[in-house]
Amino acid sequence: MARKTLRARRFFSLIFPFFFITSVYAEQTPESAKTVTVEAKNETFAPQHPDQYQSWKATSEQSAREDALAEDPRLVILWAGYPFSRDYNKPRGHAYAVTDVRETLRTGAPKTAEDGPLPMACWSCKSPDVARLIQQEGEDGYFHGKWARGGPEIVNDLGCADCHNTASDDFAQGKPALTLSRPYAERAMEAIGKPFDKAGRFDQQSMVCGQCHVEYYFDGKNKAVKFPWDEGMKVENMEQYYDAIAFSDWTNSLSKTPMLKAQHPEYETWSAGIHGKNNVTCIDCHMPKVQNAEGKLYTDHKIGNPFDNFAQTCANCHTQDKASLQKVVAERKQAIHDLKIKVEDQLVHAHFEAKAAWDAGATDAEMKPILNDIRHAQWRWDLAIASHGIHMHAPEEGLRMLGSAMDKAADARTKLARLLATKGITHEIPLPDISTKEKAQKAIGLNMQQINAEKQDFLKTVVPQWEDQARKNGLLSQ
């Protein structure tokens, strides 16, 4: 695809004034940082930044829910034994961040602050209240306890104070005042040689998004968020890191494989692609400068598909028309989807074949190399498919990861065939009917009627109590 670098650089230098951007941790003295509380209520900043606020609020228009498990029931098998096998929707607007984490079946139906399956860390990318709590309680205090503990505290959707130092003079004067509001993200950027306060403005713009649009895991007894970047950001680097510390997110209930669950590694995959390598940032494509009714330029906070603002995004660098670029992107998306399905088919068979091997009396020693292949295959598949927009951000890297996943899955199945033969099993291991989400969930033993009923009761009884308490404490507008 054609890209006129000089033209793009000139455009960006004209369209984005040189803002003085700094981290809140670097800008404020320790004394002042203790006295200025993070303001999490997004509407507080509407009078100062009306265009940005209204465009952010418009993310509520991105309301459609797409059920990824219904679209592709194979996922239920790959995530058997993990909450993602219950519920996995494709992402929607930032205005639904808190609603969606409350309503997903993955967070369970806790009755008390000490109840439920997940830790506090599961709030970490959902709200500016997280930055407020980290400031008030420290990281150890924030991460302590179960997810339900944060219910009455984390109530405002992902917004202003997640990305901006809203207490700064720069922000009051209409400047972006970008900041990393999550200390663990700041440490991760330093680990890859990108300290935020020394980064250029192009890097900072993407680093802010990279606080959340990344792979991460829950570390230690406190289940604190950490990015696995100590060895690098490529899929093999992170795999090596996880293997070295013997980390797993869960054990697949069919194959008994210690698994890794990739999250949403857009920062890593963007960095590996042509846009990241040429300093085309998340902001350039997903939050372009647009004009308001008075002709004033502002950053559009209705984060979405670049094709929705083609003239302000793609057309600044590319000479092709919109239809031509859409065709290229669609072809890349289809290529990745086709290989994704092929890998999933192999992994589904591998999990059931591993179960058959266990049932036939296989030993831990016999299964260890096989499970390692399954772990590595699914990790590489997952990092590719969990990265939203990889067909645009880094299609070559996506295909490379999926190709590697296919090879690892084939290795696992070859070893399984040999092992099963030693147990007297030479026929193909039959699969149950997993043609729908419901049938796949039944095949792994999920009682979805009970799970859904418990969730509905939680939403009707517990969540209203959280919101009432938040209003009484002044955390939500009345």
From Swiss-Prot:
Entry binding sites for heme: 122, 125-126
Molecular function terms from GO: calcium ion binding; heme binding; iron ion binding; nitrite reductase (cytochrome, ammonia-forming) activity
One GO CC annotation: outer membrane-bounded periplasmic space
Binding of heme c 3, residues: 94, 209, 212-213
Coiled-coil residues: none
Keyword line: Calcium, Electron transport, Heme, Iron, Metal-binding, Oxidoreductase, Periplasm, Signal, Transport
Binding-site residues for substrate, renumbered to this chain: 216, 264
Binding positions (heme c 2): 160, 163-164, 301
Cofactor binding notes: Binds 1 Ca(2+) ion per monomer.
Residues reported in the UniProt entry to bind Ca(2+): 215-216, 261, 263
Subcellular location: Periplasm
Pathway: Nitrogen metabolism; nitrate reduction (assimilation)
Signal peptide positions (record): 1-26
List of residues binding heme c 5: 275, 314, 317-318
Catalysed reactions, as listed in the record: 6 Fe(III)-[cytochrome c] + NH4(+) + 2 H2O = 6 Fe(II)-[cytochrome c] + nitrite + 8 H(+)
Main location, first listed in the record: periplasm
BP terms from Gene Ontology: anaerobic electron transport chain; nitrate assimilation
Family: Belongs to the cytochrome c-552 family.
Protein purpose: Catalyzes the reduction of nitrite to ammonia, consuming six electrons in the process.
UniProt-recorded name of the protein: Cytochrome c-552
Species of origin: Salmonella dublin (strain CT_02021853)
Gene: nrfA
